[in-house]
């Protein structure tokens, strides 16, 4: 019997990739990456010369098909694998990235009459121009005491589905009326592949306020009478967990991709969330940290708990049969990059060059020689606001304790420690809310690059940290869901637990907490938490006052 394979399609912000994976052992056989021709559209609408307003971030849905039709044939060619041996395809996508489409599934921006209307295009996840609509939703929900607010830390983000949908209605009612569906890009790709609209629970729950149902028509009517039946008329109330077979690959799509018609197509998922089983996690109490420019924390529990400061709790949102809790830090790697770029003197860069290493490695070696607390420097990790547990984008970073003898290495270590304190705050909040966290797993770009950071995280949280073996954990996890959608009868797996047992692996390196270091960090964390509560919970609004002065000064220039 021929070896069987699956393909994970990972749609990111700037590019898309395909990872071809062997079903029997998770071997990553081939990968192809293709950038989107139009990238992130935040200046001029393509083909129109129309200038976009500030905070807009759009994409061209043609780019998604462009990538699809290139990366899959490429991994087949590079690997020598026959399309007949591919048993499943799964997709993940940034979210909320949504668009209006007609009855045939054609995005309205691809129709001549709407090509020059920005609201007919794909609104990318980081489109923030729907903030007024988000404010209206939050104010009304708070006024009415809507229970859904508590599930999302007390605020609905402008990045999410309903603010974006309401913006279309507000600014372009003709687009809203012409749309047969408002749909997530991830669900649209599934529709293109198999001809079936099967909306996934992950994005519905975390980005569209779904909790085995949506908010009532009465709530939407109170926002705008025209919005009353947005769910009935423009969406779907049929929601499916990960790993469900959405349908079989359409013959015309199979021909373009070099695959066989009827190949299993899985329901979609959000990029971070699909990675969890690829880190070997298939049950409750094990937190997966996707560590890169920002940090996403995911953990499953057996009971629904409403915990302040979480990004959401969704049944079947991460793993079928569990409640998935999501939290996050808006900047981690981005803070380190900022520090290296703006706070390190040229002399350090030259010393690093002479030592044959980069600045991170050079400072990391010096910082590793310090003991916890030795620098006397402490930071609040809010360079890009705070997602969890304060849910406040207007908070800013803070560094204190510097003297005339403070070194770049001491400051660098304090920055690393601050991000670990941010994660520790999230863990404590979850556990105090009744969600135990027994183990930590890490994946993403940072764990393999910064061993000092990982040891600090272990010491601060007082937990062992295991590292995913794959450098493409998201795409691998995505592919695993394709194997589940295919099922054992086709050579795949009937559930994600069996898939993970065969296809997911961990590195040999395990970061174990040092009890003495943790004892020292508890003292530092107590100070961190005092500052966290002072500046983050309204005790002192100095950060917001400074930000307001800055904004006013720039407007007055």
PLM regions: where:
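N-terminal phosphate-binding loop and adjacent alpha-helix
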Residues: 33-81, 124
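Phosphate/pyrophosphate-binding loops at sites that engage ATP/ADP/AMP, CoA/4′-phosphopantetheine
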Residues: 68-87, 172-175, 219, 223-232, ...
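Gly/Ser/Thr-rich active-site cleft segment
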Residues: 11-13, 138-269, 336, 380-387, ...
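Conserved phosphate-binding catalytic cores of ATP/NTP-utilizing and phosphoryl-transfer enzymes
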Residues: 1-2, 250-259, 269-286
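A polyampholytic, Gly/Pro-enriched intrinsically disordered region
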Residues: 50-57, 131-156, 285-288, 484-501
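Glycine/Thr-rich phosphate-binding loops that ligate phosphate moieties of nucleotide
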Residues: 1-43, 62, 84-138, 174, ...
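Stable alpha-helical structural segments in soluble proteins, enriched in small hydrophobic residues
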Residues: 67, 71-79, 189, 276-279, ...
């Amino acid at each position: 019997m021929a070896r069987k394979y699956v393909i994970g399609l990972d749609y990111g912000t700037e590019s898309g990739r395909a990872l071809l994976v062997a079903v029997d052992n998770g071997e990553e056989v081939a990968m192809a990456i293709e950038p989107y021709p139009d990238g992130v559209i935040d200046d001029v609408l393509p083909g129109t010369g129309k200038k976009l307003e500030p905070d807009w971030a759009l994409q061209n849905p043609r780019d998604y098909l462009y990538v699809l039709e290139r990366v899959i044939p490429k991994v087949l060619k590079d690997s020598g694998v026959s399309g007949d041996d591919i048993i499943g395809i799964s997709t993940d996508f940034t979210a909320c990235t949504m668009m209006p489409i007609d009855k045939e599934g054609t995005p309205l921006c691809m129709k001549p009459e709407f090509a020059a209307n920005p609201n007919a295009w794909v609104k990318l996840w980081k489109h923030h121009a729907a903030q007024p609509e988000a404010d209206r939703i939050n104010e009304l929900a708070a006024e009415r005491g809507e229970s859904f607010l508590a599930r999302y830390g007390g605020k609905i983000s402008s990045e999410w589905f309903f603010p974006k949908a309401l913006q279309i209605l507000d600014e372009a009612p003709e687009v809203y009326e012409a749309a047969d569906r408002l749909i997530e890009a991830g669900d649209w790709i599934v529709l293109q592949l198999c001809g079936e609209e099967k909306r996934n629970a992950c994005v519905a729950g975390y980005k569209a306020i779904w909790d085995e149902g949506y908010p009532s028509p009465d709530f939407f009517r109170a926002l705008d009478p025209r919005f009353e039946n947005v769910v009935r008329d423009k969406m779907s109330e049929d929601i499916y967990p990960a790993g469900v077979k959405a349908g079989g690959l359409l013959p015309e799509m199979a021909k373009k991709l070099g695959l066989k018609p009827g190949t299993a197509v899985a329901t979609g998922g959000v990029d971070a969330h699909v990675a969890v089983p690829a880190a070997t996690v298939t049950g409750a109490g094990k937190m997966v940290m996707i560590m890169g420019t920002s940090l996403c924390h995911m953990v499953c529990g057996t009971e629904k708990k409403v915990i302040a400061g979480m990004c959401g709790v969704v049944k079947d949102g991460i793993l079928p049969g569990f409640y998935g809790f999501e939290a996050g830090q808006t900047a981690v790697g981005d803070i380190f990059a900022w520090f290296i770029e703006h706070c390190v003197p040229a002399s350090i860069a030259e010393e690093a060059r002479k030592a044959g290493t980069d600045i991170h490695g050079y400072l990391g070696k010096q910082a590793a020689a310090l003991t916890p607390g030795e620098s006397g420097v402490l930071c609040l990790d809010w360079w890009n606001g705070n997602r969890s547990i304060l849910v406040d984008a207007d908070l800013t970073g803070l560094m204190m304790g510097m003297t005339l003898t403070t070194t770049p290495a001491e400051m660098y270590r304090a920055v690393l420690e601050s991000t670990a304190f941010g994660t520790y705050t999230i863990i404590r909040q979850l556990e105090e809310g009744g969600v135990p966290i027994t183990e930590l797993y890490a994946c993403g770009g940072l764990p393999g690059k910064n061993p000092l950071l990982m040891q600090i995280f272990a010491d601060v949280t007082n937990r062992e940290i295991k590292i995913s073996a794959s450098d493409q954990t998201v795409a691998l996890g995505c592919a695993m869901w394709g194997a589940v959608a295919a099922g054992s009868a086709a050579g795949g797996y009937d559930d994600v637990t069996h898939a993970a047992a065969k296809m997911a692996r961990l590195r040999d390196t395990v970061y174990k907490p040092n009890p003495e270091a943790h004892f020292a960090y508890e003292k530092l964390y107590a100070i961190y938490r005092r500052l966290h509560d002072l500046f983050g919970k309204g005790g002192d609004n100095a950060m917001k006052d400074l930000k307001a002065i800055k904004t006013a000064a720039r407007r007055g220039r």
